[in-house]
């Protein structure tokens, strides 16, 4: 399971011209699910996202997690994160989870994160437009 997390001052996701999710300060989480993923991996990744210390403390050091920074999460499904790009000029999605498994684990990941702080979401399998203001920029690839 993969999360590309970006520290943002704001982010939103639109579907068919309508904003369906938006946050202020927090993390934009692009979530990719691979075919070997399960709830245990989702639990580990949620814990890592919620506790990863990438917000500045009073000394301007990355020392606070999103909860301590009183931030929010915008979680967006992103199947292309599971792509294999090692060969050729076209990505292979053979490592990606089936849509049913990916949706189940996406919803489960959202539920786990929402137990700790405010969460907005994209729409699974939709054509979405995501806009953000990356704060830093600060972007990390988390894989469990």
UniProtKB/Swiss-Prot annotation:
Molecular function (Gene Ontology), one example: tRNA binding
Motif residue range(s): Gly-cisPro motif, important for rejection of L-amino acids: 136-137
Quaternary context: Homodimer.
Catalysed reactions, as listed in the record: glycyl-tRNA(Ala) + H2O = tRNA(Ala) + glycine + H(+); a D-aminoacyl-tRNA + H2O = a tRNA + a D-alpha-amino acid + H(+)
Function per UniProt: An aminoacyl-tRNA editing enzyme that deacylates mischarged D-aminoacyl-tRNAs. Also deacylates mischarged glycyl-tRNA(Ala), protecting cells against glycine mischarging by AlaRS. Acts via tRNA-based rather than protein-based catalysis; rejects L-amino acids rather than detecting D-amino acids in the active site. By recycling D-aminoacyl-tRNA to D-amino acids and free tRNA molecules, this enzyme counteracts the toxicity associated with the formation of D-aminoacyl-tRNA entities in vivo and helps enforce protein L-homochirality.
Domain of life: Bacteria
EC number from the UniProt entry: 3.1.1.96
Family annotation (NCBIfam families): D-aminoacyl-tRNA deacylase
Protein name, entry field: D-aminoacyl-tRNA deacylase
Keywords assigned: Cytoplasm, Hydrolase, RNA-binding, tRNA-binding
Domain remark text: A Gly-cisPro motif from one monomer fits into the active site of the other monomer to allow specific chiral rejection of L-amino acids.
Species this protein is from: Haemophilus influenzae (strain 86-028NP)
EC class name: hydrolase
Keyword tRNA-binding applies: yes
Compartment(s): Cytoplasm
GO biological process: D-amino acid catabolic process
């Amino acid at each position: 399971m993969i999360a590309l997390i970006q520290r943002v001052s704001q982010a939103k996701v639109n579907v068919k011209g309508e904003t369906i999710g938006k946050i202020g300060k927090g993390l934009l989480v692009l979530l990719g699910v691979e075919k070997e993923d399960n709830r245990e991996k989702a639990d580990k990744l949620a814990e890592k996202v919620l506790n990863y210390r990438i917000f500045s403390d009073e000394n301007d050091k990355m020392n606070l997690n999103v909860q301590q920074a009183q931030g929010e999460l915008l979680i967006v499904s992103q199947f292309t994160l599971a792509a294999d790009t090692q060969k050729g000029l076209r990505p292979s999605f053979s490592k990606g989870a089936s849509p049913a498994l990916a949706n189940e684990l996406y919803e489960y990941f959202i539920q786990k994160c929402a137990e700790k702080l405010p969460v907005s979401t994209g729409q699974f399998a939709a054509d979405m437009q995501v806009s953000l203001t990356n704060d830093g920029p600060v972007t990390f690839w988390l894989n469990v």
